[in-house]
Amino acid sequence: MIEMKEVYKAYPNGVKALNGISVTIHPGEFVYVVGPSGAGKSTFIKMIYREEKPTKGQILINHKDLATIKEKEIPFVRRKIGVVFQDFKLLPKLTVFENVAFALEVIGEQPSVIKKRVLEVLDLVQLKHKARQFPDQLSGGEQQRVSIARSIVNNPDVVIADEPTGNLDPDTSWEVMKTLEEINNRGTTVVMATHNKEIVNTMKKRVIAIEDGIIVRDESRGEYGSYD
């Protein structure tokens, strides 16, 4: 479970990104975070995986407060949070298999477990047949699906996706969304920040709309809304 309680975030330059946000996201939910540019969506997302720390308030992930945990505890919390970025962040000199395996290698997992788990998640994202290829040999959609595989290889409770279709064409975007929906159907919570109106309106998931750092709308089967 993800809980935010009266969360504020003010940056040193005076920008107030979040202004007293309180929200609960339950296990297994699929949630879109929408709003105009500069509304606070990215800050909201970054709070969940502790890339940003709140100025004030509580952020609880499975009852652990990310606002007060020690720095040395952060890597352990992140093991249960998968992150998918807009720009993939794949390592160009590693194969598809190696990119996904890296997430397990850094925590000291056994080689036999790594091989089994990596092949399982590559099969899930339908890229097992490209395990030995390098990122520059893949399409944009394929690279993003590798990124998704990497985000779930450690069996996270939550997957955070920050504009995962932002650099993709419409058809490829839908391929990525089908993959995220399949992950959600298997029980993983998915929280996704997006500007893609068509995807939000078609898939009919929970929508949290943020404007000027506050939640202005929270609907169980919501739509995107109108933003410039």
Swiss-Prot record:
CDD domains: ABC_FtsE
SMART domains with a match to the protein in the record: AAA
Pfam families: ABC_tran
Signal peptide: none
Binding site for ATP: G35, P36, S37, G38, A39, G40, K41, S42
PROSITE patterns named among the record's database cross-references: ABC_TRANSPORTER_1 (PS00211), ABC_TRANSPORTER_2 (PS50893)
Membrane topology: Peripheral membrane protein
UniProt record similarity statement: Belongs to the ABC transporter superfamily.
Entries under PANTHER family matching the protein: CELL DIVISION ATP-BINDING PROTEIN FTSE, IMPORT ATP-BINDING PROTEIN
Protein name: Cell division ATP-binding protein FtsE
Source species of the chain: Bacillus subtilis (strain 168)
Lineage: Bacteria, Bacillati, Bacillota, Bacilli, Bacillales
